[in-house]
Amino acid sequence: MGGSNMVVVESLNKVCREGELEHNYSYRMTKGKISLSGYENPIELQSYGIEIERQDIVKGDIINIERDFVKDISCQRYKVHKLLRLLYDNSVSPIHLIDIIGEYIDKYIEDFDNQLKEIAIN
């Protein structure tokens, strides 16, 4: 595995309160590269992913942090942005990330194939 350095390209934040408990949510779109081998020369495509972090805070102290991410969801930034908004608008917790976006991931995997076909044609 090469150094997969992901860069955060968009971040949406919100705070939800339940009595004394405060949840700080961060929804981030990450950008990286996916390397596809099996060709004469390995092909690198731009890819976008999502990371969600939730900090649970009581009286200013962080008592718990949950985080999960999925990289390489699609090479189409707008699709991942829409997913990010969906998660943000519904205050989705990191622990539910995979449940919510699993079916999208299965669909969007085709984007990489389509991108490869375009490269092959040109």
PLM features: residue spans?
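Negatively charged, low-complexity tracts enriched in Asp/Glu with abundant Ser/Thr
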Residues: 1-37
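Residues embedded in well-ordered secondary-structure elements
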Residues: 18, 39-41, 69
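A positively charged, amphipathic N-terminal helix/segment that binds anionic biomolecules
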Residues: 25-42, 84, 94, 98-99, ...
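Generic "edge-of-domain/loop-turn" microfeature
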Residues: 34-36, 57-59, 78
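A short, structured beta-strand/loop element
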Residues: 42-67
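A short, exposed loop/beta-hairpin motif centered on an aromatic-Gly-Thr core
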Residues: 62-77, 82-89
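C-terminal charged interaction modules
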Residues: 85, 89-122
